[in-house]
Amino acid sequence: MSSQSHPDGLSGRDQPVELLNPARVNHMPSTVDVATALPLQVAPTAVPMDLRLDHQFSLPLEPALREQQLQQELLALKQKQQIQRQILIAEFQRQHEQLSRQHEAQLHEHIKQQQEMLAMKHQQELLEHQRKLERHRQEQELEKQHREQKLQQLKNKEKGKESAVASTEVKMKLQEFVLNKKKALAHRNLNHCISSDPRYWYGKTQHSSLDQSSPPQSGVSASYNHPVLGMYDAKDDFPLRKTASEPNLKLRSRLKQKVAERRSSPLLRRKDGPVATALKKRPLDVTDSACSSAPGSGPSSPNSSSGNVSTENGIAPTVPSAPAETSLAHRLVTREGSVAPLPLYTSPSLPNITLGLPATGPAAGAAGQQDAERLALPALQQRILFPGTHLTPYLSTSPLERDGAAAHNPLLQHMVLLEQPPTQTPLVTGLGALPLHSQSLVGADRVSPSIHKLRQHRPLGRTQSAPLPQNAQALQHLVIQQQHQQFLEKHKQQFQQQQLHLSKIISKPSEPPRQPESHPEETEEELREHQALLDEPYLDRLPGQKEPSLAGVQVKQEPIESEEEEAEATRETEPGQRPATEQELLFRQQALLLEQQRIHQLRNYQASMEAAGIPVSFGSHRPLSRAQSSPASATFPMSVQEPPTKPRFTTGLVYDTLMLKHQCTCGNTNSHPEHAGRIQSIWSRLQETGLRGKCECIRGRKATLEELQTVHSEAHTLLYGTNPLNRQKLDSSLTSVFVRLPCGGVGVDSDTIWNEVHSSGAARLAVGCVVELVFKVATGELKNGFAVVRPPGHHAEESTPMGFCYFNSVAVAAKLLQQRLNVSKILIVDWDVHHGNGTQQAFYNDPNVLYMSLHRYDDGNFFPGSGAPDEVGTGPGVGFNVNMAFTGGLEPPMGDAEYLAAFRTVVMPIANEFAPDVVLVSSGFDAVEGHPTPLGGYNLSAKCFGYLTKQLMGLAGGRLVLALEGGHDLTAICDASEACVSALLGNELEPLPEKVLHQRPNANAVHSMEKVMDIHSKYWRCLQRLSSTVGHSLIEAQKCEKEEAETVTAMASLSVGVKPAEKRSEEEPMEEEPPL
């Protein structure tokens, strides 16, 4: 057997392994099994059997060669395996690196895309922000251009066009006319109007403590004849700069002191020095003057002037409020660096309530103010002044009040227009006279603040040796401390003089006059105990006296019925008993008058101190009327009855003079429609017409913070219901709502003014008065009631004051009725011409309170913009919010016929179906004729509100309470209040004119009523049968109702023989069903 040679020494036949070519190497699997390459270790089925014969015989012949051959093959196989393994590892590494590079590239690409997207988004935001800034800038420019155009139009107005701002020529002509008319009277009577008694200089005048060493320097001297009043040229020297006997050195010294005082305020400008100096002249005392209504006005006419009304009974609010006002103004300045461009809050959908009112004219110059003040003096001659009053100019004691330096002109104009009543003899010399006239509208509680300053301490000032206060808070405490000490000392001296004078008069000849025991301090409980002496005539409580014999003289200025009754009462008195009775009555009146004056001053002083955050507690002395050491008790027993625990079951009235102190610090009420003269005029009207005497006057109180939080949020209650010291503890972001008004005062918007000291107390007092009256009516102590309160409340929302309102009085009263008395059904009727958005918000989801509002809506274009007919409530309160929204503007304006139709077709049917337990009325009278378009514009009569009140009295068993809301024309609100109170008393109302009875409602009103009825017919079935009579007049509607009632009665009288009488009545149609 031959074998061929091989390079490896092996025969080609016996070589079991062949070398791998590169192509096969590349296609080899990644894993190799070594066992397959070893013939000795492979299973027999894995390798084919070798059947060759030569091979079998060669194995035993060449064992060594075979072994060597196997070793070589195994070695070669191991080498190939290592090579393949290295190739596979290299391939794996190459692919892994390739995949890693791809992943990294993808990751970089993704990051790049994200960065590009972020860059694009940021660029878009920048562009959007730039567009907003540009748009805001354009809006500001347009608004500025618009204001400039309006101002330019006012400046370039033609003389023939109407304007609310009087031109200079008109003012000069009016002033010249008044001066010429009053020149002779002023020249003839000026010297008689000035008191020359030096005691009045120190006891009744106000001057700075810097001038304590010198007599008061008045603008005019009492010992010289004065020149005739006339016009002064602006180029001339100021006529009242100094008197002839005053040296220039003393004048310069006084001017330096006054400038130093004024410059202590950060708000005062250096340029307003002459104006402020002109206002610091000494007051002129007038001892024999009185005020009454304007000439030609009867007892129903209100005060024709809305002058500055701030206080009464000799306690001026400007003295304690000066440091507090300065504190607030200082915070306004230091927070942002300047007071001006602070944003004004606007209502939810419309601007402020007074938007569109004519602008007030510029303040007159100092010379004009001097002329107006001197013109008022002759008109006060030969008149009776109320006890404890005299005339004094308005003194600006705070920087904010100095900005409105012309604020005292309305006071003097108010005094010039007063009518001169018949002169009466004073009851007691030195005490003033008791007004016994019956035709006066302005009572003792209506006199302006500048008149109530007779026996009052001097305004507080800083002595030359006193150090300057370091901050506003230190100044406030210093002023209050000085005021407290001076007031008590002054009051003690005054009371001792009065008691000594009275003891000399009424003491018996056989008994020497005893020194009276003075009690200048009194506890709060005793003040409350004596309130009965202040609210009702003392003569009504005298035992053993007939009422007709005492109707002629009343201490609290209650109007007498007539002069004939007085004369008749005098004739009925027996001649023998007349001297003793009159003398005893005179003594009692004198003692009571002294007690009333003292209690008035203490109450007002204590209230002003508490409003400023300084509690004042008096010693627990007994009331002087019950002390045996009193001179009055030496002659006759002085019995003071406690106020009755249960009032008369009649109409209740509530009113408090502290609400008069809520007024703007500018002092100009002409620029603020909601002023103190509103409620003062109403109260005087009720007193003069005799309605007040027929009602039960209850005592009001301040609502607690917990009561206010039943409707308002805690932050809102603390911000607007606490004193300045507590407000300083709040977050500065909350107090930023206060802004500086154009008039110089402070407010939360251009309508809603804010007084740092008195506004919170007045707002809480208004709520408390309404709550007290509502609870007395709900519990059956009173029949019904009328609350003469301010500020109003139906616009105040949970956390937002607006529209003159801070706290919602009616809403708080309704919430407390639900919580404390568990009243299940309460009806709130709001007939103010503006929608009560605050009351609607408070009860929008409450099914137990039905809120019905009659207001001017004009498709949301009238303040406040809310009150659409489709606002029916939410949740369980759906259907219990009824908005009788009148649309169509003032073409024509709504009147009596439209409101009577709305009551007939919407209000009364729903109210009867609701069947309330108590009825509350937000009684705003700004829908009465006489209000300008922005404040109302409707033409309702005052009689109409009397008829609306009479209809509501048929609900809830007569438990009806009216709370004053809006209304800014004094004549309109006085007439409407008189009509409502007369209706509450059950008096017969004056009939409506025939024109109103036969007048049909206008098309706009019919459309508005049909829309409301269509919306609410799904909630109130009573509206379905009245849709056909919406357009009828009152006479036509009554005729239809009469015919329907006759038809129902006739059908009820029909009989069917087969049916028993008992079943016939059940199948007859009801009155609510339409007639067959």
Curated annotation (Swiss-Prot):
Record's compositionally biased regions (Basic and acidic residues): 132-162, 258-273, 514-529
Catalytic reaction annotation: N(6)-acetyl-L-lysyl-[histone] + H2O = L-lysyl-[histone] + acetate
Coiled coil: 66-169
Superkingdom of origin: Eukaryota
EC number: 3.5.1.98
Segments of skewed composition (Polar residues): 205-224, 626-638
Domain notes: The nuclear export sequence mediates the shuttling between the nucleus and the cytoplasm.
Protein name: Histone deacetylase 4
Organism of derivation: Mus musculus (Mouse)
